[in-house]
Amino acid sequence: MQLILLSSLLLLGLSLANGHETDPEGQILNSLVETVSRLEKKIDKVENAFLTVHRARSFGSGSERLYVTNKQVGNFEAVRNTCVQAGGRIPSPQLLNENKAFASVLERHNKAAYLVVQNSAKFTNWAAGEPNNADGNKLCVKADAQGAWHSASCDEDLLVVCEFSFI
């Protein structure tokens, strides 16, 4: 919407610069400027409301990331696709407080979920004896209901949990 208004202002300016007085008293231009100003104020309000909600949601965990489930289950590929379509990704906790926030979702539903472990991760939460891919079939990682990490088959149907990072 703002782009359309700015384009209109540009076209009007070009028209006036070329000597075509389509708005001799500047009413259209003034109206467009007022509309853009109102839209900017509304955008500021939406941004502030969004940040307030985000801060409230992350207040308890101290995490800047939000972990959400749709209560469905799926294998790794299905979970990844679901998260990407929702604008998120499979969780990848980088800090203890992020893992706690992620684990709180799992604990609430008493289920495990996939996560992605970064090769350069400074934080890990492997359960005792993990990672363990002795049979060669555990190429994914899951977190149990308490947030401990385990090697897992990518074909397991686990709780869909997606990570969203807004800041």
UniProtKB/Swiss-Prot annotation:
Disulphides: 83-162, 140-154
First and last residue of the signal peptide: 1-19
Gene3D superfamilies: Mannose-Binding Protein A, subunit A
Protein localization: Secreted
Record-linked InterPro entries: C-type_lectin-like, C-type_lectin-like/link_sf, C-type_lectin_CS, CLec_Tetranectin-domain, CTDL_fold
GO biological process entries: ossification
Keywords: Disulfide bond, Lectin, Secreted, Signal
Other information: Concentration of this protein in the serum is 8-fold lower than in the E.quadrivirgata (another non-venomous snake) serum. This difference may reflect the difference in the food habits of these snakes. E.quadrivirgata preys upon snakes including the venomous snakes, whereas E.climacophora only preys upon small mammals and birds.
Subunit comment: Homotrimer.
Function according to Swiss-Prot or TrEMBL: Has no PLA2 inhibitory activity.
Name of the protein in its database record: Phospholipase A2 inhibitor alpha-like protein
Native species: Elaphe climacophora
